[in-house]
Design a protein with these regions (language model features):
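Alpha-helical recognition/docking segments in bacterial nutrient-uptake
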Residues: 1-44, 48, 105-108
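Short glycine-/acidic-enriched loop or helix-start segments at secondary-structure transitions
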Residues: 3-7, 27-28, 47, 66-67, ...
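Glycosyltransferases and closely related glycan-assembly transferases
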Residues: 7-14, 74-75, 124-133
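Hinge/beta->alpha junction and helix N-cap segments in small-molecule ligand-binding domains
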Residues: 21, 31-41, 56-101, 114-122, ...
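A conserved helix-loop-strand patch within extracytoplasmic ligand-binding domains
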Residues: 46-54, 113
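Short polybasic/polar patches that bind polyanions
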Residues: 47, 78, 84, 129-131
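Short acidic capping loops at alpha-helix termini that bridge into adjacent secondary structure
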Residues: 52-54, 83-86, 133-141
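Flexible loop/turn connectors
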Residues: 104-207
Length: 207
């Protein structure tokens, strides 16, 4: 992505923060969900259920959160399962794109799919059920975000809960402190907030 606007703001000593987009070369604090922690929790949960053919369906890895998810997934799959070339599909964060890419994951033998967003999870479930398969009877699915109503689906979606209120309030507080500071100096810092795995009805034992 183009970093010029960030450097221009820093040169003008205009305080700013970033959210879920950390870049070491950007002189500003970033407030992010611990994507790696969330992916690790998701893989560990599926591994405990007996899954070894686990796939990741995420966004394009030029986007920072998607890259962090893919890197963490590759690492934890190697550590827990010994799979050093795991199944990863990159696509857009849309229902339609996820639905289309789910076919490739199933063709490669995935019995569980971790997605980069709840919307992607819904797209994956749509494809799975359209093929006459069940969630979680045949395929387990995990989302990421824990957006509104995910607990009211059938099955309710197992997902990674992002602590959005904490992230936003901390980012706003930091920004106002910088605006009040008479000696403001643009400085990079990372503030990582731990997500939580919310286990619901879309994950089950491998068969």
């Amino acid at each position: 992505s183009d970093l010029a606007p960030y450097h221009d703001a820093a040169a003008r000593e205009i305080p700013f923060v970033t959210i879920n987009g950390t870049r070491p070369e950007v002189p500003a604090p970033d407030f992010s969900t611990g994507d790696a922690l969330g992916i690790r929790a998701a893989v560990a949960h599926l591994h405990e259920l007996g899954h070894t053919r686990i796939a990741l369906l995420t966004g394009r890895t030029h986007i920072v959160p998607a890259l962090r998810k893919a890197e963490a997934f590759t690492q934890v799959m190697g550590e827990l399962i010994g799979d050093h070339s795991p199944i990863i599909e990159e696509t857009f964060y849309t229902y339609e794109a996820a639905a289309a890419h789910t076919h490739a994951l199933l063709e490669r033998g995935a019995t569980a799919i971790i997605t980069g967003s709840d919307l992607q999870a819904l797209g994956a479930i749509r494809t799975i059920t359209s093929l006459g398969l069940s969630v979680p009877g045949d395929i387990s699915v995990i989302g990421f975000d824990d957006t509104f109503l995910m607990g009211h689906l059938d099955p309710a979606l197992t997902t990674i809960h992002q602590p959005v209120p904490s992230i936003v309030s901390s980012a706003v507080r930091s920004l106002f402190e910088a605006l009040r500071a008479p000696d403001y100096v643009p400085t990079h810092a990372d503030y990582v907030f731990s997500p939580d795995l919310i286990v619901r009805g879309s994950t089950g034992h491998a068969h």
